[in-house]
């Protein structure tokens, strides 16, 4: 390569980067994710009892001020699984986190932020769930554990399933979401308010809940819940 061409490469790269920056949409333009924050509560979701909850101060403090939350705790309404009347029965947590203007300060890769909440030994793998409307979606399934207390010295096991929902997109990994977001910014001129949808619960043999039972209940809730809140007409 001739010296002149080599000298021009940095300038060409800088011009290309400047062009990308200028091509990005304005900061105040956000396209809403194709998912409703209004998860059903009470007995509105057949087979389940839902109770709306508030995000914690810890969750709020580490995310941008314009991050939006929607959280509902569910218990199976059938005594064949576990009763919402039993205050000691496991709860299945469903949450949606909507990004703000600065997505990097609103939505994080779960495998990175969950350890900060006390979860450890995280392992992830791809999974698919068939929904009640006949559609099949890809998820990431995380297994982890969290200490019950220093005095006990043992842990509860946790299962989480998650996806990212954009405008007309459902992505099962953080990398897929980032790539889609970059494509939309560069080629369609849009900035999306991405939503992070997660459902999880805990299990332990000494409380009478096996991993298989916990996993089955989480999958059953997702199968019933997502058809109610995803805006399928956008897909």
Give residue ranges: language-model regions.
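Alpha-helical transmembrane signal-anchor/signal-peptide segments
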Residues: 26-45
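Alpha-helical transmembrane segments of multi-pass membrane proteins
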Residues: 19-26
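Generic detector of short, well-ordered, non-transmembrane alpha-helical segments enriched
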Residues: 41-45, 115-117, 193
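A short, solvent-exposed beta-edge/loop patch
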Residues: 4-19, 127-235
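Short, solvent-exposed recognition patches
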Residues: 52, 57-185
């Amino acid at each position: 390569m001739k010296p002149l061409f080599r000298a021009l490469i940095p300038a060409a790269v800088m011009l290309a980067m400047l062009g990308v920056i200028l091509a990005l949409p304005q900061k105040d333009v956000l396209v809403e994710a194709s998912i409703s924050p209004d998860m059903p509560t009470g007995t509105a979701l057949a087979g389940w009892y839902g109770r709306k909850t508030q995000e914690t101060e810890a969750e709020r403090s580490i995310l941008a001020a314009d991050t939006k939350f929607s959280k509902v705790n569910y218990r199976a309404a059938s005594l064949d699984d576990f009763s919402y009347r039993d205050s000691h029965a496991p709860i299945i947590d469903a949450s949606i986190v909507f990004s703000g203007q600065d997505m990097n300060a609103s939505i994080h890769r779960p495998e990175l932020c969950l350890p900060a909440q006390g979860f450890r030994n995280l392992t992830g793998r791809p999974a698919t769930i068939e929904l009640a409307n006949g559609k099949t979606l890809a998820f990431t399934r995380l297994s982890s554990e969290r200490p019950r207390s220093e005095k006990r010295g043992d842990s509860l096991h946790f299962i989480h399933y998650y996806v990212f929902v954009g405008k007309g997109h459902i992505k099962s990994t953080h990398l897929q979401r980032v790539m889609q977001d970059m494509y939309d910014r560069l080629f369609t001129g849009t900035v999306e308010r991405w939503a992070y949808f997660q459902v999880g619960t805990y299990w332990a043999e000494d409380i009478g809940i096996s991993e298989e039972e916990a996993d089955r209940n989480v999958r059953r809730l997702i199968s019933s819940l997502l058809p109610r809140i995803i805006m399928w007409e956008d897909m």
